[in-house]
């Protein structure tokens, strides 16, 4: 195989290589003969379709597929021959002839000696208690609460339906009429000064509040201003929580309505949530330590930019899903994500290097356990498992996640670490 490599930057390489034409023609010819034996075309007996007809009908597609496969195979072989470790996907361009190609790509930087025993990691521990289960049941009751109108003054936990309008200097918001809405006092949905001002109001009562809005407030006309906010309590309602009886328990999928089974199911769900939260904490902790230890290592620029653009796209999509309009995204908006992207790339490459240097292998048992854990959150777990097994993209994503967790655990076990005991609530708090 003809291939040459040159450095075009600290971490950029250019690989020039030539495809073996004989192998391509051999593959194309073999595939066309196979199609001639198996293809049914009207007017010809099975297996008797002339090669010329097969060539006219399938030749272009067969050649394109063969070229793509051989291109990938030849490039991979050249990469192995030159002991290159790619960081990201290559850009492959046509060379001077149909069989000459030029691949431009970035390589993994030299991290030197990766000694994880020098890292200091705090490993959080926590467990699910009966009190946590009690609190979850209380939260479920709150989800199913109904509201009963009352004549007394509003207090924390009450639902207040209200009308508001604001006066910011000479500007009235809205210009005419009022804005309507509702809020549960103590939920933190409304601005704190307004929410506290609603406490004690009775149905039909009006009040003017003096509110100091912060400079970064989401409504530009109010941001950084002292505003007179006029509020009227249209109705005040108190919550009515359902009893934890068989009907309530059955509504959450426990067909027997048994209280002990209900608590056992809740414990299982909370332990699954806790396991994920503790891994996320450990991933963040190990990542921060790796960043601190290897921040001096240069990262592949194009890979970092690609990651920054991906992070921007994710944020824009989140804005859309929330029902808001992200507006026109500037062409250079990804620049605001470059620092975070560089850190993410650094951790990802280091995790890969640790796995490679220490010959860590994906544990199929752990993949199966993680898949079962994911599937258990759905009503039809077996269907979810089957979906993953039949979708290479989903399964590859799962395997990558599990491999990363294996490496994170491996690093944490060998680093200098201290344990930090947390309550369930503290452990799951972001």
Swiss-Prot record:
UniProt-listed SUPFAM superfamilies: FKBP-like (SSF54534), Triger factor/SurA peptide-binding domain-like (SSF109998), Trigger factor ribosome-binding domain (SSF102735)
Alphabetical list of HAMAP family matching this protein: Trigger_factor_Tig
Localization per record: Cytoplasm
The PPIase FKBP-type domain, residue ranges: 157-242
InterPro entries: PPIase_dom_sf, Trig_fac, Trigger_fac_C, Trigger_fac_C_sf, Trigger_fac_ribosome-bd_bac, Trigger_fac_ribosome-bd_sf, Trigger_fact/SurA_dom_sf
Lineage, broadest ranks: Bacteria, Pseudomonadati, Pseudomonadota, Gammaproteobacteria, Lysobacterales
Biological function: Involved in protein export. Acts as a chaperone by maintaining the newly synthesized protein in an open conformation. Functions as a peptidyl-prolyl cis-trans isomerase.
Superkingdom as given in the UniProt entry: Bacteria
Coarse class of the protein's main subcellular location: cytoplasm
Organism in which the protein naturally occurs: Xanthomonas axonopodis pv. citri (strain 306)
Entry-linked PANTHER family: TRIGGER FACTOR CHAPERONE AND PEPTIDYL-PROLYL CIS/TRANS ISOMERASE (PTHR30560), TRIGGER FACTOR-LIKE PROTEIN TIG, CHLOROPLASTIC (PTHR30560:SF3)
A single GO BP: protein unfolding
MF terms (GO), sorted A to Z: peptidyl-prolyl cis-trans isomerase activity; protein folding chaperone; ribosome binding
The protein's enzyme class: isomerase
Record remark on domains: Consists of 3 domains; the N-terminus binds the ribosome, the middle domain has PPIase activity, while the C-terminus has intrinsic chaperone activity on its own.
NCBIfam families per the UniProt record, alphabetical: tig
Catalytic activity, as annotated: [protein]-peptidylproline (omega=180) = [protein]-peptidylproline (omega=0)
Descriptive protein name: Trigger factor
Keywords, alphabetical: Cell cycle, Cell division, Chaperone, Cytoplasm, Isomerase, Rotamase
């Amino acid at each position: 195989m003809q291939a040459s490599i040159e450095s075009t930057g600290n971490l950029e390489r250019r690989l020039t290589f030539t495809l073996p034409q004989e192998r391509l023609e051999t593959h194309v010819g073999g595939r066309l003969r196979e199609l001639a034996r198996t293809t049914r075309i009207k007017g010809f007996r099975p297996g008797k379709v002339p090669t010329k007809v097969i060539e006219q009908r399938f030749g272009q597609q067969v050649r394109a597929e063969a070229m793509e496969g051989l291109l990938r195979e030849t490039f991979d072989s050249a990469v192995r021959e030159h002991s290159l470790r790619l960081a990201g996907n290559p850009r492959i361009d046509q060379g001077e002839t149909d069989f000459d190609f030029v691949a431009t790509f970035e390589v993994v930087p030299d991290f030197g000696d990766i000694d994880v025993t020098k890292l200091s990691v705090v490993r959080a521990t926590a467990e699910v208690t009966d009190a946590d289960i009690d609190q979850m049941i209380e939260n479920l009751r709150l989800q199913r609460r109904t509201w009963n109108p009352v004549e007394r003054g509003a207090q924390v936990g009450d639902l207040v339906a209200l009308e508001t309008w604001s006066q910011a200097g000479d500007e009235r918001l809205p210009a005419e009429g009022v804005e309507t809405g509702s809020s549960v006092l103590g939920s933190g949905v409304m601005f704190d000064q307004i929410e506290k001002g609603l406490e004690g109001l009775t149905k039909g009562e009006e009040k003017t509040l003096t509110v100091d809005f912060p400079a970064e407030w989401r409504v530009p006309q109010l941001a950084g201003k002292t505003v007179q906010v006029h509020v009227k309590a249209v109705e005040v309602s108190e919550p009515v929580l359902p009893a934890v009886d068989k009907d309530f328990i059955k509504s959450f999928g426990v067909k027997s309505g048994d209280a002990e089974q209900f608590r056992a199911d809740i414990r299982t769900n909370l332990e699954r949530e806790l396991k994920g939260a503790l891994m996320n904490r450990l991933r963040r902790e190990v990542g921060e330590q790796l960043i601190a230890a290897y921040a001096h290592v240069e990262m592949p620029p194009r890979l970092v930019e690609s990651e920054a653009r991906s992070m921007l796209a994710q944020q824009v999509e989140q804005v859309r899903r929330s029902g808001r309009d992200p507006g026109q995204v500037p062409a250079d908006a990804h620049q605001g994500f470059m620092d975070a992207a560089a850190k993410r790339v650094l951790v990802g490459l280091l995790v890969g290097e640790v796995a490679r240097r220490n010959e860590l292998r994906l544990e199929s048992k752990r993949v199966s356990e993680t898949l079962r854990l994911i599937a258990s959150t759905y009503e039809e777990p077996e269907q979810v498992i089957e979906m993953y097994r039949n979708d290479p993209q989903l399964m590859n994503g799962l395997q990558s996640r599990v491999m990363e967790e294996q490496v994170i655990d491996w690093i944490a076990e060998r680093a200098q670490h201290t344990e930090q005991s947390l309550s369930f609530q503290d452990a799951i708090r972001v």
